[in-house]
A protein has these predicted regions:
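Loop-centered beta-sheet repeat module
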Residues: 120-193
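Phosphate-backbone binding and catalysis cores of DNA-processing enzymes
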Residues: 1-119
Length: 193
């Protein structure tokens, strides 16, 4: 894969953009790739949603998500969230998604029933954190949006830093840099950083 990811916060926009980068631009084929789990939307870096190959989502997220997770941690106190609440959100998400993908409203309903009050930005924050920690990812199209799925069941096994790069960060950074320069060049190291 020459590219690593493309920004994808606007789902219809990123589907169209991805389709335009294929030999036969067809948004239906992009949706089919999402449904098959070959491409995925995730939060690998900068607190932004990206569309990327499923085989790259976990290792890139493990490599790049620490700054956005630190920034998110600073936003928790005003939301009334702490690590205990996030642990409960993760536990309930793992249980709720164990039988397969579910919609965001369904997951937020599970959190509401668990006393986690997902309104007022709390649900988004909990979901962002679980995606940036490679616990949950966007999964198949449900007709109006993407359902949410467990990374462990939706993304390829062995696609983490340990599986792809023997846990070594330097070869992973080199791969990411090579792909960045191939898709964005000419560019500098500062551009990459």
């Amino acid at each position: 894969t020459a590219h690593v990811a493309m920004q994808g916060q606007d789902l219809p926009g990123v589907i169209a953009s991805a389709a335009l980068r294929t030999p036969r631009p067809d948004p239906g084929e992009v949706l089919a790739e999402l449904d098959a789990g070959r491409i995925v939307r995730s939060y690998p870096m900068r607190g932004t949603v990206f569309l990327m190959p499923s085989s790259d989502a976990v290792w890139v997220t493990q490599l790049c998500s620490a700054p956005s997770l630190r920034a998110a941690a600073a936003r928790r106190p005003p939301l009334g969230l702490d690590e205990g609440a996030l642990a409960r959100a993760e536990e309930t998400a793992l249980e709720a998604l164990a039988d397969g993908p579910r919609s965001r409203p369904e997951l937020f309903g599970v959190w509401e029933a668990a006393g986690l009050a997902p309104k007022g930005g709390r649900g988004y924050h909990m979901l962002f954190t679980l995606i940036a920690r490679s616990t949950v990812c966007h999964g198949p199209w449900n007709g109006t949006d993407q359902d949410l799925a467990l990374v462990s069941s939706w993304l390829p096994a062995g696609s983490d830093l340990a599986g792809r790069f023997n846990g070594e960060r330097i070869p992973a950074v080199a791969e990411l840099l090579l792909r960045y320069l191939s898709s964005h060049g000419p560019a500098t190291i500062r551009d990459f950083a």
